[in-house]
Amino acid sequence: MLVLGLETSCDETGVALYDSRRGLLADALFSQIDLHRIYGGVVPELASRDHVKRMLPLLRQVLDESGCRTGDIDGIAYTAGPGLVGALLVGASCAQALALAWGVPALGVHHMEGHLLAPMLEEQPPQFPFVALLVSGGHTQLVRVDGIGRYQVLGESLDDAAGEAFDKTAKLLGLGYPGGPEIARLAQDGRPGRFVFPRPMTDRPGLEFSFSGLKTFALNTWQHCRASGDDGEQSRRDIALAFQQAVVETLIIKCRRALKQTGLKRLVIAGGVSANQALRSALERMLGELDGQVFYARPRFCTDNGAMIAYAGCQRLLAGQRDGPAIQVHARWPMETLPAL
């Protein structure tokens, strides 16, 4: 089955073609970072308009790169949520229109299921069951995964997601957007030990997360530096390092607990923050100590992309799932409500 995947949940327009026998044939992506950078964050209306502008050129690009024709496509998968409603509607309406014109089925895909399954596109994909750490700008969750659609949320953030905390901390330090890569860049030259941030909710049982306090701690630290006249670039680097260390160590502690609780030794990390090299290195060390395995997608499939949507949609289309005639998207969508395959 050849599936066209469309991703428009936020500020990236992604289009890909995935074949159930041959694998990923082509993928194309347009990032709106430059469009939103001057505003310090995503402007939903601008995001929606740009998705409209980019969709068909990207579709032509993947068809040209793959050598496929529209008549070869057997189904269309698109991100139906969670995400920005206006942006989601662009992808959903495009998918439904093309499906009607081409006489093929369409299916809305859960954005975070796409992220969770992105490592399946690699040469050595994980085997079920495993624990997944989904860590992005909008989500931080630990999930037990026994199969596609067989998800048990073990713990999640009670306030800011990890990626959101990265972006907000970068903004208060006067750094660019998106904040995650900026924090990671500065942290490389930070001095260990100058600042020590708390590891939130690690002093009690459970697998929940809370990152809003870290953002406040960073703000107070930065304000103290400014008040004392020590607000130069080195202080920014030191705060960035202390913040990143706190987030990474918090995630490591919770992942270790989740693996112990489930008795599993396979961990999948997915979502935009999974591209953070400090986090990857720390997880690899931890899984080495536990004689376990860690899996993640290549960096370009950590952030939003059409390939993960095409893959996830292909699995569900092969199982016979189809959309009805109505276009439905979801700003919020609990992953546990998805049907199991």
From Swiss-Prot:
Top-rank EC class of the record's enzyme: transferase
SUPFAM superfamilies xrefs: Actin-like ATPase domain
UniProt entry tagged with the keyword Metal-binding: yes
GO terms under cellular component: cytoplasm
Gene3D superfamilies linked to this entry: 3.30.420.40
Binding residues for substrate: 134-138, 167, 180, 276
GO molecular function: iron ion binding; N(6)-L-threonylcarbamoyladenine synthase activity
Catalytic reactions on record: L-threonylcarbamoyladenylate + adenosine(37) in tRNA = N(6)-L-threonylcarbamoyladenosine(37) in tRNA + AMP + H(+)
Pfam family, one: TsaD
Necessary cofactors: Fe(2+)
Residues that coordinate or bind Fe cation: 111, 115, 304
Localization in the cell: Cytoplasm
Listed EC numbers: 2.3.1.234
Major site of localization recorded for this protein: cytoplasm
Gene Ontology BP terms: tRNA threonylcarbamoyladenosine modification
Keywords attached to this entry: Acyltransferase, Cytoplasm, Iron, Metal-binding, Transferase, tRNA processing
Leader sequence residues: none
Cofactor mode of binding and number, as noted: Binds 1 Fe(2+) ion per subunit.
UniProt record similarity statement: Belongs to the KAE1 / TsaD family.
Function in brief: Required for the formation of a threonylcarbamoyl group on adenosine at position 37 (t(6)A37) in tRNAs that read codons beginning with adenine. Is involved in the transfer of the threonylcarbamoyl moiety of threonylcarbamoyl-AMP (TC-AMP) to the N6 group of A37, together with TsaE and TsaB. TsaD likely plays a direct catalytic role in this reaction.
Protein name per Swiss-Prot or TrEMBL: tRNA N6-adenosine threonylcarbamoyltransferase
Organism, scientific name: Azotobacter vinelandii (strain DJ / ATCC BAA-1303)
Biological classification of the source: Bacteria, Pseudomonadati, Pseudomonadota, Gammaproteobacteria, Pseudomonadales
